[in-house]
Each structure stands twice: as structure tokens, then as C-alpha cells.
């Protein structure tokens, strides 16, 4: 039997540490970011990091060029008079085109150019249903009075479809034999994520320092942000794991009861946490201790001006505290009704045990 009459195996979940913050550390570009998740139970960062990485690289939906037609060209193993690049080079360049489809599963785009000029991706004709991300991508170089007329086939998908398997593309099965004349397949890389790596560091919860911190380093192709990539991967994992989740009624009731108990307090239970759990610098921690600020609920009621008037407390310490409070969805200068509550030490201990 999986359950007895009194105790559910799922009740053990209540004792696990749950992440309290997700931070996004961005580089200068919108395509690269570090996503930081903490605290996690020891070993969980490795499990989650590996699962999220694999899903982001293999299962996210994106858009890619899966084929082209060039006027006057019947196959890729040829060249075009007056064009510097061979058709093979043009095909490889088209494989690097990154685009985004909005409300459409596939699209045919047109490119018409006349030399002398460099033909860039930004010269492709688009509409509201399709946008080009890397508009500076070089497609080819045209000589004097040379014309290039190209049809570009774009579709949504996931993973990678090489030209050796292009006949598996369902869209090609809808094309007539006449339409397939001159069709040149392109290696289709649909994944919007270029690179993902992760590392695990120690995280601190109060006086406990053996918890995990997961840091995901993500680089996308610009069609989505790293935050969106993590969000999509997490949702995919959630959907795949849903069938394994038990319908244990007693566990659900305990979850509802726990949630209702938090609401009965009349304020955010995070306020019952001690400032020792905020992982502040020694200077900031000592300043709060000297001012008899024990709980986060005590701290948030202080204004910035009051904090700056504290001895040895400067702007750097203020910014540090504001950043930590922001991760909890809190700020300085808040008005907390009925604070401090009666038996605050007992409530704080109860809240810690529930976490």
C-alpha cells in the first residue's frame, strides 16, 4: 500500500526547503543571462539544473528556415553568375537566419535584390506575422546588375531537422510535385536556445550553509529571452510530471489548511523571519542588531531616512538591504498593521517549523 489511514507520504514534502528567490543577472545583451535559484535542498540543484538544461536544448519551440527556392537554380550544387557565394554557401547562410512567427505555424517570405550590393537578412520582405531577428546576417553578395529572387520557407518546430530527413517534414507532403521543383532543403535548427550551462554553489538558510544554489547560464538566439526559456522548460517538466502526482486527498487538505493559516495572520509570514536569515554583510547585520531590529517585520517599517541615521550605516548597506527585501516582495517604509503580534517568538518558531 502507498498510504495508511493517518499519514501520507506526501506530507514529507512540507519539510523540504523551497526556493525563496529567482534572480536574473543580465549581460549587456538581451540574449545572455544568469538565472539564480536558491535555496534548494542539497542535491536538488544538480537534479533541476540537468533537467532544465536538457529540456531547454531539445524541447523548446522556435522558428527556422527549412527550405528555399532561387529563381533560375534547380539544385544547391551550382553557382549563380555574378554572385560571389556558391548556392551551397547561400543555403548555409540561410540556415543561420533567426526569425519569429507570430500567430502562424509556417510562412513563405520573399527576397528580391539587385546588385551591386550585399544582400542582408533585413532585406527580406516580412509582415506582422513574421519578424527577422538577425537583420545584419549576410546572405550573399551581388555583382553589377545581378538580380536575386528567392522564396524562403519558414516554419515553427522544435529540435533539429537535418536535410537528410527533410522528407519527414509534414509541410513538404502538402506541396505538389510542381512546387517541389527547385526546392532546396535547409538544415532547420528550431531551438531558440544556443547554449545552456549550470553550476551549483552553496546557499545559506539562517545558520545552515549546506543548501544549494543553482546558477543557469543561458544564451538564446534573440527570439526569446533567457527568462522565457527557463519558464517554458519548467512548464514542460511540470506537464510531464503531472501524471505521477498522487490524488491524495489528505495531503491536499493539509496544503489548504496551511495556506489558510498563513492568511489568518493578516500579513505576509515572511515578516516573521529573523533578519539573521537575510544573509547580510557583517556591518549591516551589526547595525540592525544594535538598533534591536530582530524580525523582517521590524525592518520594513523603518524608512530610508531612519536607517541612514543609524550609526555606521551607510548607503551601501541601505542598498544591500533594499535588494534583499525586493526579493521577498517587500520594501522599507511599509505600514504593517497589528505589528508586532502577540507571542511573536512562538509564531516565528511555528513558521520556521512549517517551512
From Swiss-Prot:
Biological process, per Gene Ontology: DNA-templated transcription
Catalytic activity: RNA(n) + a ribonucleoside 5'-triphosphate = RNA(n+1) + diphosphate
Gene Ontology molecular functions: DNA binding; DNA-directed RNA polymerase activity; protein dimerization activity
UniProt keyword annotations, A-Z: DNA-directed RNA polymerase, Nucleotidyltransferase, Transcription, Transferase
Keyword Nucleotidyltransferase: yes
GO cellular component: cytoplasm; DNA-directed RNA polymerase complex
Family recorded in the similarity comment: Belongs to the RNA polymerase alpha chain family.
Record note on domains: The N-terminal domain is essential for RNAP assembly and basal transcription, whereas the C-terminal domain is involved in interaction with transcriptional regulators and with upstream promoter elements.
Protein name: DNA-directed RNA polymerase subunit alpha
Organism: Wolbachia pipientis wMel
Gene assigned in the entry: rpoA
